[in-house]
UniProtKB/Swiss-Prot annotation:
GO terms for biological process: Golgi organization. This is Dymeclin. Belongs to the dymeclin family. The modification Phosphoserine is found at S347. Keywords: Lipoprotein, Myristate, Phosphoprotein. The keyword Nucleotidyltransferase does not apply. It comes from Drosophila pseudoobscura pseudoobscura. A lipid is attached at G2 (N-myristoyl glycine). GO terms for cellular component: Golgi apparatus.
Length: 700
């Protein structure tokens, strides 16, 4: 079987492509032409430079296409060929469909390349014009005669017909009713959801997902709102939102590794998919996550590995985020579908179920890749809006598999972008809304946490390391980001957990009190500066005005108050289980002196003073009997005293319970963030020079 292999280098001079973008109409049933055009192998661009090289080699062909297609309608013919091949695929056996899959992929790749070019250089209306463009009657007649004549005769006929039709076709408007475009979208969805993912169909599924992303990228290049976009309206009125969302989430959960060859072909170009390769396909498709497990990569490095080895999962994840974060002000069937899915191992009795999926597979995959932005965003959506998935996660016995990677993202804050830090903290806040979670994290013990380098800790609870990382994030934010909302989310998570603090590691107790101490020193400095005369040196720096300092002081007092309430909540509810915290408070009692008479803090400090006074007097009595006490002896006295302590002595405060509430107009945050991730970590590389509506310089 002879196969024409077209490499990137010779695409610009390919005779079939030149005819396709030329001035002659090519009918969709011209099998000789389409077989010639679609019999090529191509290495897909792997990065922006590859895409740039491909774009530059195709530039002349694309310009010819733009100049001629509205007259020839060849793009519409290609779309029709794709529609026919997609329809035929559903009825073919594996062996019969290999060549079909290959040609369908090639047709779709050409369509995507042209759609991308039109998006980047034209308008959405022009894109739809090219989809719907029909050839003139003269060109159609010439194409019919072309198929019937000898090469010499056909060339003469085509030239004559082209010259006769050129003037009329150039001025005739192309009417856009969107019918072919809608049919094309439906075919893409059918391809994704109906055809099973096998080794030789993997790249076809990937190309279909990439095609949808490329179509929706019209948002990047248009200056109109998506509510007015015909592309968005067509995609979002799709009747099959549930099955598409189900397929995409299954692609993510299964994390199938990209096959070593495309369409089951060997390096020699054979398209035979034999028994041996079938067995190899089954074997390689089951060997999941080995690459990522072996590397132990996180963050940006993991994102690149995920894109390279699991492109279908990566692109499906990005498409899920696009579909669920756009059009949130009105009914969004994709969003409702994701939020309404249920575990396939359950039989939900309440609420509408959009589709069922193995939550265990989703959970395990998210645990593995949650250090990448797009996975954190998906986890956020599922936890925040899918109650069934939230309950499922809360029942897991290995919560450390999910929480530790999130903590690593926060720990590596200088290497993470602010959006990712923010979303990771929100996920922790949502998790901390569950009392079961707050109890369980202190029963899960961890050993030898090598990535935490501040101090060597041989053993600590998951709750303990969580507290340490959140405190560290607060301190990092104070120095670098100064984001009030970041402080709020950090403290809200700690506050939710505080009533369940147990068996705190000595270092955790020290860091909790040290956090207050650090904030207290800053408060004292700011307060002193504000009380200095207005003409003193403190105001020489015009950037820091008195108003700025007053605002800083107000925020600082809110944070200090919250830290005191967190300490008070722990002492009120868990004092008997937190001897190390009591020990640290006794040792650091002086840090509270300046706040006993402060109107904003005195009621909470009074409780802490009462606890410190109770244990201090007991220690004093024991010391009078035994002399100086060692650390273990002090802890023994605290433990005995705790058994006799009654929290009824303390002033009552409301329980600390905070719930995450999404801000107004969340799309203003999420849409630019999602498209930044698509541009940075996706397999489709767009021209950054042409992007108008979304800045892609968010540090990812």
């Amino acid at each position: 079987m002879g196969i024409n292999v077209s490499r990137t280098a010779d695409l610009g001079s390919n005779e079939w492509l030149q005819r396709f973008v030329g001035r002659h109409h090519i009918a969709h049933d011209d099998e000789a032409f389409w077989n010639g055009l679609l019999n090529y192998n191509i290495v897909l661009p792997e990065n922006s430079q590859d895409q740039l090289n491909l774009d530059s080699r195709l530039e002349t062909l694309c310009q010819s296409f733009i100049g001629n297609n509205l007259k020839t309608g060849n793009f519409g013919s290609l779309v029709t060929v794709f529609l026919e091949k997609t329809s035929e695929l559903l009825s073919l056996s594996d062996q019969e469909s290999n060549m079909h899959v290959w040609q369908t992929f090639n047709a779709l790749f050409i369509i995507r390349t042209l759609v991308k070019y039109i998006n980047e250089t034209g308008s959405e209306f022009q894109l739809l014009q090219h989809f719907e463009a029909l050839p003139s009657a003269e060109l159609v007649q010439a194409a019919v005669e072309l198929q019937q004549q000898t090469p010499a005769e056909s060339a003469t006929i085509a030239i004559e017909a082209t010259e006769q039709a050129a003037a009329a076709a150039a001025s005739a408007p192309v009417f856009v009713d969107g019918a072919k475009f809608e049919t094309f979208i439906d075919a893409l969805v059918n391809l994704i959801v109906v055809i099973p993912v096998k080794e030789f169909t993997y790249h076809l599924h990937l190309e279909a997902v990439n095609m949808l992303i490329t179509l929706l990228s019209v948002h990047l290049f248009a200056q109109q709102p998506t509510e007015k976009s015909i592309v968005f309206r067509t995609v979002f009125k799709c009747q099959h939102a549930n099955v598409l969302m189900s397929a995409l989430l299954h692609f993510v959960a299964r994390m199938v590794e990209v096959p070593h060859t495309m369409f089951g072909s060997s390096s020699a170009g054979s398209i035979v998919f034999g028994i041996a390769e079938s067995l190899l396909s089954i074997f390689t498709f089951r060997k999941q996550q080995d690459v990522l497990k072996a590397s132990n990569a996180v963050g940006g490095e993991l994102s690149l590995q995920f894109r390279t080895h699991y492109p279908l999962a990566n692109q499906s994840l990005l498409l899920i985020l696009i579909l669920t974060n756009h059009c949130t002000a009105q009914e969004n069937a994709y969003r409702a579908s994701l939020f309404g899915c249920a575990d396939s191992k359950d039989s939900p009795k309440q609420g509408t179920v959009s589709f069922q999926i193995d939550f265990s597979a989703v959970y395990e995959t998210l645990c593995r890749i949650v250090t990448i932005d797009q996975a954190t965003l998906l986890l956020y959506l599922l936890l925040h809006r899918n109650e069934r998935f939230y309950r499922f996660v809360m029942q897991q016995q290995d919560l450390e598999q999910l929480v530790i990677p999130i903590l690593q993202t926060l720990y590596n804050a200088p290497d993470s972008n602010s959006h990712h830090i923010y979303m990771s903290l929100i996920v922790l806040l949502i998790l901390s809304e569950d009392e079961g979670f707050n109890k369980n994290v202190h029963t899960i013990m961890l050993k030898n946490i090598t990535w935490y380098t501040e101090r060597s800790i041989s053993e600590i609870s998951l709750g303990g390391i969580l507290i340490l990382i959140v405190i560290r994030t607060i301190q990092y934010n104070m120095l670098k980001m100064r984001d009030k909302y970041l402080h709020t989310n950090c403290l809200a998570a700690l506050a939710n957990m505080s009533g369940h603090f147990r068996a705190l590691h000595p270092y955790v107790a020290q860091r909790l009190v040290s956090l207050f101490e650090t904030l207290a020193r800053k408060h004292t400095r700011l307060d002193a500066q504000l009380k200095e005369p207005a003409d003193s040196a403190v105001f020489v720096n015009v950037v820091t005005t008195a108003e700025d300092m007053l605002q800083d002081l107000s925020v600082l007092e809110e944070v200090l108050r919250m830290v005191l309430e967190i300490l008070n909540s722990c002492l009120t509810n868990q004092l008997v289980y937190c001897p190390n915290l009591v020990y640290t408070l006794l040792y650091k009692r002086s840090v509270f002196e300046g706040f006993r008479s402060h109107h904003a803090f005195q009621d909470v400090v009074q409780n802490i003073d009462m606890v410190v006074g109770f244990f201090s007097s007991r220690l004093q009595r024991v010391q009078e009997q035994r002399g100086e006490l060692g650390v273990n002896e002090v802890l023994e006295v605290i433990s005995k005293g705790a058994s006799q302590w009654s929290s009824d002595r303390l002033r009552k405060f409301p329980d600390l319970k905070f719930k995450y509430v999404e801000e107004d107009a969340p799309e203003e945050f999420f849409i630019p963030y999602v498209w930044t991730l698509v541009c940075k970590y996706g397999c489709v590389h767009f021209s950054s020079e042409s992007i108008k509506t979304v800045t892609t310089d968010i540090a990812c």
